[in-house]
Amino acid sequence: MTVRTRIAPSPTGDPHVGTAYIALFNLCFARQHGGKFILRIEDTDQARSTTESEQDILSALRWLGLEWDEGPDVGGPHAPYRQSERKDSYRAYAEELVAKGRAYYCFRTPEELDVIREERKAQGLPPGIKGDLELPDDEVKRRLAAGEPHVIRMKVPDEGVCVVKDMLRGDIEIDWGQVDCQILLKSDGMPTYHLANVVDDHLMEITHVIRGEEWINSAPKHMLLYQYFGWEMPTLCHMPLLRNPDKTKLSKRKNPTSINFYERLGVMPEALLNYLGRMGWSMPDESEKFTLDQMIENFDIKRVSLGGPVFDIVKLRWLNGLWMRENLSETQFLERLVHWSYNNDYAAKMIPHVQSRAETFSDVAPLAAFMFSGYLPIKQEDFAASKLEEEQLKKVLQYSLWRLEAQRHWTKENIFADLKALSKAMSVKMGDFMMPIFVSIAGTPNSWSVVDSMETLGPDMTRARLRFALEVLGGLSKKGLKAAEKEFAQISAAIDATEKN
């Protein structure tokens, strides 16, 4: 048997360090066993998937030094490697299950399903949708003939226990009563993750599924689908989730999660990959610094610890410092520095702003220094010139951060539209609103267009600086944060409603 592993990211946002973490362990497992590592794009969420995000993911993983044997950009015997290009095949598999009596057509509206969930909740039952939605055959035929919108759901046992076998965790028992009748095919004909994932893993001959522990509760559905189709199931291995220093799940609301952020911060790809390799795993000799080749040579999946590995930027910076001092000659250091700081693509975006303000070339460094920094050395006094009360100032930064977290198309036009809409909704003059934004992003209220800077810096660096500015100001209290979340939800809903009209 040839070992075949895969990583299957969704192109719906910035390339996440969690994706790189799982990709690294899949790659090491495959290479250590002389197998193949496959990259597949899971773009079944057509509303959120973008080609830009896909390219960002591929570029970021390659920047780290991860290479795949098959994928959308390199091809392979199981092409295509984008689920959107395979969508015509999924309906046949879903209907095969209907014909076998393992799935059924569901015509319930979202409103009807909400009522059912509330009724189950009131009865003290799990809110998941169970099999009582199935209709008599004659009614199904009538509704299908009438062209009524429908989905296809899988059937799930009402009682009993499912035993999931895991390489790291042994037997995991999950009550079937907790498992809902998962939608397999959506009303638009696109498969859900669960159907597409199982079908593609089978067709691509995946032997080992190494993924995050957040998928444990989905494992019973996947086991059932393999059973229903009569296919051999891959071996499962659920990796521990990356955590923030406070042990909560790693998320962009608390820490930068984009690989692009760490590249812009000036972290070496070798160091970031090394750090991800230490997330829940260690070398046999406990050495902290190692290359990808060394990790592959010594890799044993059984050495993974199930304790939540903490992704700590302070420790990453320390490790990166070791790499810079111990692995780069002075010439190599200079080459990397020049490539990082003055690569044409990045620098070209700043030239119009710098050239129009500079009188000598020596003016360039002070004018553009904030564009070549990570976190800025700002202090509370830097916001002293603001005309806003302290709590209102914090809300401006907090609401801007939350609003921009939802921005999927990172352009200066969209950034400005978001900030302008917030300014209006909060009844704060645009100039007063933008002042703390300028300080947070540029370190001073006197800089070139801050939205241009935000576009160039990228979403993760922008959000990191806004988050850091809030920390400098002391942030909102727990009580204040709860009230702010409620107020922001109302403001955001009003803005969205206005934009639709």
From Swiss-Prot:
Catalytic activity: tRNA(Glu) + L-glutamate + ATP = L-glutamyl-tRNA(Glu) + AMP + diphosphate
The name this protein goes by in its record: Glutamate--tRNA ligase
Enzyme class: ligase
Keywords: Aminoacyl-tRNA synthetase, ATP-binding, Cytoplasm, Ligase, Nucleotide-binding, Protein biosynthesis
EC number: 6.1.1.17
Stated role: Catalyzes the attachment of glutamate to tRNA(Glu) in a two-step reaction: glutamate is first activated by ATP to form Glu-AMP and then transferred to the acceptor end of tRNA(Glu).
Single GO molecular function: ATP binding
Pfam family name, one: Anticodon_2
NCBIfam families per record: gltX_bact (TIGR00464)
Extent of the signal sequence: none
PANTHER family the UniProt entry points to: GLUTAMATE--TRNA LIGASE, GLUTAMATE--TRNA LIGASE, MITOCHONDRIAL-RELATED
Residue positions of motif 'KMSKS' region: 249-253
Record-linked InterPro entries: aa-tRNA-synth_I_cd-bd, aa-tRNA-synth_I_codon-bd_sub2, aa-tRNA-synth_I_CS, aa_tRNA-synth_I_cd-bd_sf, Glu-tRNA-ligase_bac/mito, Glu/Gln-tRNA-synth, Glu/Gln-tRNA-synth_Ib_cat-dom, GluQ/Sye
Subcellular localization, as worded in the UniProt entry: Cytoplasm
Gene3D superfamilies, A to Z: 1.10.10.350, HUPs (3.40.50.620)
GO aspect biological process, one term: glutamyl-tRNA aminoacylation
Binding of ATP, residues: 252
Oligomeric and partner information: Monomer.
Any one Gene Ontology cellular component term annotated for this protein: cytosol
Gene label: gltX
UniProt short sequence motif 'HIGH' region, positions renumbered to this chain: 9-19
